[in-house]
Structures are given as structure tokens and as C-alpha cells.
Amino acid sequence: MKSIKRVEKVTSHLSDFGQWYTDICLKAELIAYSDVKGFIIYLPYGYALWENIQKYLNYEFQKTGHQNVYFPLVFSEKLFQKEKDHIQGFSPEAAMITSTGQKELFEKLVIRPTSEVLFSQYYAKIISSYRDLPKLYNQFCNVVRWEKATKPFLRGKEFLWQEGHTVHATEKEALDQTLFAIQLYEKLGKELLALPFVCGRKTEKEKFAGALITYSIEALMQDGQALQAGTSHYLGTNFAQSFQIQFQDQDHQNKYVHQTSWGVSTRLIGALIMVHSDDEGLILPPYIAPIQIVIIPLQPKNELVQAEAKKIFDDLKTTYRVHLDLQNKTPGWKFSQYELKGVPLRIEIGARDLAQGEVTIFQRYNNSKNNFSKNTFKAEIPKLLKTIHDKMYQKAQKHLEANRRQASTYQEFKDHLQKKGYVAMSISGMDAEIKIKTETGATARVILETPLITPNCPVTDKKAIQTVLFAKSY
């Protein structure tokens, strides 16, 4: 790829939001396309974002005793069919291996769309007593789901994710674990991604296949469409009964275990791009950015300038993810390149800066430049990074709140949907939900734990039972 291609202007998000998003994914060198639709190549800069999400989660898992494992990519179709609700939910997008070379397989193999059945089969083998509980397992892996419409990070035939699978003696322990996971994801959004989420319980129609309860985190993109960014499921004893996962309690009674599963994926990277970026390219929150600070000597052949740039690099590299750019490119090209890549801070050092005892620091999130004393600027960097993160979160939160409405009539609901964003309405249940999706394209995101807006459902005129947040979504 020629260097000029990496600094071409991206499409304006106002003229074509979808192309703007794709341009950023490609031109910021996050991904490349493979020869099979829906299977992307994660380039180093894009994969580093996922690695930083993994690091954050692993740090949290170490505190709570969750252990990482890795289970196989394939399992038998017979195993897949053991939980009837689960297979009905995933069969349409499950990919199968039916032959090897010229030989047809006696039994089809399922390529992992999710791993509940594999974990359940294993748990049935190793759990027999209350002393074996709880089991707190997690794996980072890839999954394959044969999606029709694909988009980098947001919806692919293959994607990367984290999936937790836990087993407990009681319903309460499992429900607590289900809430722990969704609260962890909310914390991940706030502390690492600068992403505010709406968190809540899914409706019966939208819950995970095979679960009793599903919670989700929902993000709102700049174009007003919602994105489900993570889920946590209480599976009850559904899989335990299908796979006969039983234990003997302290009273010597045989009981079924209670299970949970929960996960986030590379969809978080898609949300990160769509929520924060602008027409110049990526804008990355500093704590997830692969490069937090780039140092650009304005006259790289000037020995004094180069020496000062290297000194700054050496001073910062043990604390931050720093890159010193000594390429034989113009400063303007480098500025555009790192703005496209969303690097939070850029330190510029030139002959004039040296003479004045200063450095210039550019902040990507608001495209501002300020001069700092070269003797004291290092103390300002952690403050700048925190301010950038906080401001990015606040901006996204403000956008979310400004695009959250409620409706008392069905017509008002439709009118609000035209503006995009979230619309809350009290409904009678699944019948109303199905009609809303059919007629407007909006889907239920989460149930709100708030009083009813109206006593009757505006869609069916039946008694309203819950207030639900709706949106059009990716």
C-alpha cells in the first residue's frame, strides 16, 4: 500500500456514515479484507486494541479467581442438539464441517458459534460434589457464525471474543455472577473505552437461546443507532438437566447446578470507532490506545533536535506506550497519519522549541495545541490523559442522553424513531414487540426498571406490563 493512501481523507460521516466507518477501519490500518466475505484480517494496530481489552479483563479475572482455559473449535452435531432451545437459536447461523478431502464425515462437526454445550459436557464429567463448586472459567477465542450482512468488527462470520462459563451450587450465586459480569462490562466501558452504556435485562423475545435471563450493555452510535456490546446470561438448570450436571450437597442430596455464560467481543472496537471518531479518522481514548504518545522531531536531521526527541522517548517509554517517529517523511504527513490513527497525544519538538525550552503537545480528541516547558511537561502528561478520557466519556454520555426519549402513543413512538436514538414505551409484551419490529424496524434493547409511562400499551391497547427501551440497531 502506498503511503499516500494512508493519509487520504476519509468520507464525511454526515454524507455516508457506513462508508466513513469502513474508511477508518481500512485507512487507519485496523483491518484488511481477506478473500472470503465476513472474515477480516486483524492488523497489528487493530489487534492491539483487542489485546488491551484482554489485559483489562484478565486483570479483573485474577482478582475474582476466574481461570482462563481453551476449549476446541469444533464439536459434534449430536452434542449441539442436546439443548433444544439453544440449537433452535443458533442452527440458522451454525457452520458445519461435512467432509475431509474427498471423504464424507460420518457425523457432521459444528464450528463453534458459542461454547455452552462444550463447557456443559466437560462440567458433567468433573463435578460430583459441592466441594467441586464453583467453577469459574473464561476463554478468549474465535467463533464462527454465518451472518448474511457483514461489517468489520460489528458483524462478521468470524470474530474474536471473551466468553465466561461458570457453575454454581445455588440460584443466588449464579444470579450474582450474572450481574457481576454485566457490571464488569459497564466498568470496562467507563474505565478503558470511555463508552457509556445503557445496562438492563433483555425481553423474553430478545434473550439468549437457552437462558432464563439475559442482561446486556447497549451503546449508542453517532448516527443514532444502537449496538449491543456485551451480554450476560443466567442459564438456570437448563443445560444442567440436558447434560446431567449434578452434585451432591452437604445434606447428601443430588442437585442440578446453576450456570452462567457471558461475553464481549471485538464489537467493542466497532463501538469505539463509531462513538468517538471524526472525519479526520480515529479518536482513541488514551487508556486503550496502542500508541498513547507519538514524538515527532520537526527537523529529524538536526542532531540536537533528534537527541532531545530520543531523550523524551527514553524518559516516557517505561510509563506510557510511546512511539518515536524518525521516518523520512514530512512533519505534515506524519501529523495526518497519527491523527488518522487517533493517537491521543503528539509531542512536537523542533529547533525553535529547543531554543525556547519548550515542547508543543497536540491533543487528538479536540485537535488543540499547547506549549509546555520541556522541564515540567512530563508531570502534565497523566493529567492530560485523564482529562482526555473523562472529556470523551462525558461527550458520549451527553450524546446518549440527548437521544433518549419516551412515548405515550404509538404515533409519538414512530415520530421519535425518525430522529433515531432510544425511545422508551410501556408495552403489553411480546405481541407488541413483534408488531413494533415488523412495522418500524426497531427492536427492544433492554427493560427499564422505571414506572410505567402509560397504564395500557399504545400498540395493542392491552395492559402494559413493562417499560422497554427500543432503537434501530446494528
Curated annotation (Swiss-Prot):
Its primary localisation, in coarse terms, equals: cytoplasm
Q: Which GO terms describe its cellular component?
A: aminoacyl-tRNA synthetase multienzyme complex; cytoplasm
**UniProt-listed InterPro entries:** aa-tRNA-synt_IIb, aa-tRNA-synth_II, aa-tRNA-synth_II/BPL/LPL, Anticodon-bd, Anticodon-bd_dom_sf, Pro-tRNA-ligase_IIa, Pro-tRNA-ligase_IIa_arc-type, Pro-tRNA_ligase_II_C
Catalyses which reaction? tRNA(Pro) + L-proline + ATP = L-prolyl-tRNA(Pro) + AMP + diphosphate
GO molecular function ontology, one term from the record: proline-tRNA ligase activity
Report the Gene3D superfamilies cross-referenced here: Anticodon-binding domain (3.40.50.800), Bira Bifunctional Protein, Domain 2 (3.30.930.10), C-terminal domain of ProRS (3.30.110.30)
Query: Which HAMAP family would you find in this protein's record?
Result: Pro_tRNA_synth_type3
Subunit info here reads: Homodimer.
Protein name from the UniProt record: Proline--tRNA ligase
Species in which this protein is naturally found = Phytoplasma australiense
